């Protein structure tokens, strides 16, 4: 018997069954490490997204996961309230806009009818004014003979008196 024969070592590491278990365990450990790293990265990302915690990565005492979740929850609730307020403001502005558009349409309608009336009355008045813009009687025929700009004395005839000589 040799020295090697006396020491028989049951080595499970050499058996195919152990390689399968060891590989499974190593694979499981790698997956678990990857999962924990992903969770850790997600918490860091969440921490960096919350304004109240943005300076925490440089501070001596970092926020715990529970603190990160609490602050994130508070921030989400705050943003929901703010979003709701903004939505109400948007709805109010839409109502105001609709009201103003309705008023504009009403004013344009009034303006249109006023312009039509002005055009109609200006066309009517052109029948009763001479080219100088002076009022003319409908029975006058449009002559300039009696313009309002002449003094009263010039419009009336002066009587000629023969002098006694």
From Swiss-Prot:
Stretches of Low complexity bias are at: 140-149
- The name of this protein is Protein max
What is the protein's major site of localization? Answer: nucleus
Gene3D superfamilies recorded: Helix-loop-helix DNA-binding domain
Q: Where does this protein have compositionally biased stretches of type Acidic residues?
A: 1-13
What does the record give as the function of this protein? Transcription regulator. Forms a sequence-specific DNA-binding protein complex with MYC or MAD which recognizes the core sequence 5'-CAC[GA]TG-3'. The MYC-MAX complex is a transcriptional activator, whereas the MAD-MAX complex is a repressor.
- Give the originating organism: Danio rerio
Gene Ontology process terms (BP): determination of ventral identity; dorsal/ventral pattern formation; hemopoiesis; positive regulation of transcription by RNA polymerase II
Q: In which tissues is it expressed?
A: High levels are seen in the kidney, gills and uterus. It is also found in the brain and heart.
The post-translation modification note in this UniProt entry reads: Phosphorylated.
Q: Which Pfam families match?
A: HLH
State the oligomer form and interacting partners: Efficient DNA binding requires dimerization with another bHLH protein. Binds DNA as a heterodimer with MYC or MAD. Component of some MLL1/MLL complex.
Q: Per its UniProt entry, which superkingdom is the organism in?
A: Eukaryota
Cite the entry's keywords alphabetically: Activator, DNA-binding, Nucleus, Phosphoprotein, Repressor, Transcription, Transcription regulation
Residue ranges, annotated region (Leucine-zipper): 86-107
Ranges of compositional bias, category Polar residues: 56-65, 119-132
Q: Where is the bHLH domain?
A: 23-79
Q: What stretch or stretches form a coiled coil here?
A: none
Positions of region (Disordered): 1-38, 47-66, 119-165
GO MF annotation terms: DNA binding; DNA-binding transcription factor activity; protein dimerization activity
Q: Which GO terms describe its cellular component?
A: MLL1 complex; RNA polymerase II transcription regulator complex; SMAD protein complex
Recorded family membership: Belongs to the MAX family.
Compositional bias of kind Basic and acidic residues: 14-38
The record's subcellular locations are: Nucleus
Q: Where is the composition biased (Basic residues)?
A: 156-165
